[in-house]
Every structure is written in C-alpha cells, then in structure tokens.
Amino acid sequence: MKFKGYLIRESEGNFNGSIEDIDIPKLEQGRVLIKVHYSSLNYKDALAASGAKGVASSYPFVPGIDVAGEIIESSTPDFSVGDNVIATGYKIGMSEFGGFGEIVHLPSNWVIKMPSELDHIKCMSFGTAGITAAACIKKIVDGDCSKKLPVLVSGSTGGVGSISVGILSKIGYEVHAISGKSSQIDTLKMMGANKILDRNEYMSDPIKPMDKAQYSAAVDTVGGDILSKMLTMIANHGVVSCCGN
C-alpha cells in the first residue's frame, strides 16, 4: 500500500520536490497511523525543502511540521480508529516524515486529540505560528499585565506577530504593531492594531539603558536591536515574550 506525499530529494547538493507514491509504513508499537486532512506551511518547512542544515535529518524526506487528521490505525489504547487528532512540534517534518503527505506514522505521545470546538482546517489555520503566539500571550495574561498601557508587537506582519495582534486585541489590550511594510497597514488595523509604528522610525533614536515606561507587555519575534529597545520601554512588572530562531 502506498500514499502520496511531497517528497524532497537531494542530488549533488541540489534539492527538488515532487509528489510521489510512498510506502505506508508498518505500524510500530507505541505509534499511530494518521490520515492527514490538513497541514500548514511554516518557515521551517521551507528550510527543510531547501536543504538547510539542521532541519531534515536525511533525504529523501517529506516536510510539514503541523498535522491535523484522523487515526486510521493505533497500537496504543490512548487512541482509537476515527479519533480526530493534532500533532505539531517534536521532530515532525524533521526526523519523521511530516504533514505534506496523506499519511504520517508518529509516536502516540506526540499526538493529542482535537478539541471538539475545532475542526481540522481551523487547527491548521493557526498551526505552529498560532501555538507560538498563544504561548507568548499566555505569559502576558499569567503575568496579569495591566490594560492601562498598550502592548507592543514586533514582526507584526509575520505569522506569530499577526496572530498575536489579533488575539491581544480580542482580549482587550490596546495593540501597537511594529512593521516595516507600509503596504500592510490596513491589514494590521483590520486585525486589531490600534497604532502602527514604522520600524525605521521606531529604531531612529539611540537605544537608552532605560526609557519611558510606555508598554505593559510585548511580544517580540525579531530579537536584536528591536528587542533591546523594547526592553527599555516596558513598565514595572511587565512581561516581554520572545520567540524565534
């Protein structure tokens, strides 16, 4: 039996992908076979497809670090055939064939049952970027950061940044979004940003050891000087959630 997958092959330092027929693996103890309904496209998937070192462990390889689907075979009592599930992170799309194929064969402890409030496509609409944004925002919420001051988001047109803007706005924060893309101003406002800060203007003044406390919290997806400046502008007992490579 075979399934179709987007297989990346390497030849003399060149990496190329195509849809190929791949053998369905025999179910191993402690693992499950999942029929993939949806995946999502992440930066790490592009790295794997282009042969970036430290991502895929070997080639040929199927990328796709996010999976939403249903169990078609299980070797563990934790899952039954027909269960709707999600898998993300761990080594999916790195040392294990990922979600850009019809079937994945994963350790059962990498898999969770899909919440009944969601469906496969909704889960993958958020994907790894959404999970990362949610983890950042949970730290802000757990820190009981005041809503009297705005929150700051860097990299706001990227996956994590844009979802952070939307969630923070939805839960009642005033959101200031840093962006270098003037063409995306209307999109950011639509997602909930109250103020757009041009990245070059934001960085135009020298970074001080301590600046005026302007924000109760921040989500940073960029690092470097942007993060350095951000840290000087956070009020006492504030939270800065950082993520990225």
Locate predicted features.
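Short, well-ordered loop/turn sites that connect or cap secondary structure elements
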Residues: 78-79, 145, 234
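Short glycine/proline-centered loop/turn elements that form peptide/ligand docking sites
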Residues: 74, 94, 177-187, 224-226
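Short amphipathic alpha-helix with an adjacent loop that forms part of the alpha/beta core around
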Residues: 202-213
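Glycine-rich phosphate-binding loop and adjacent beta-alpha segment
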Residues: 222-245
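Glycine-rich beta-strand-centered segment in the early N-terminal region that forms part
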Residues: 23-41, 52-92, 98
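Mid-domain Rossmann-like dinucleotide-binding core that forms the NAD(H)/NADP(H) cofactor-binding site
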Residues: 124-201
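N-terminal Rossmann-like NAD(P) cofactor-binding module of classical short-chain dehydrogenase/reductase
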Residues: 86, 216-219, 241
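Short glycine-centered segments of the SAM/dcSAM-binding site in methyltransferase folds
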Residues: 84, 150, 238-239
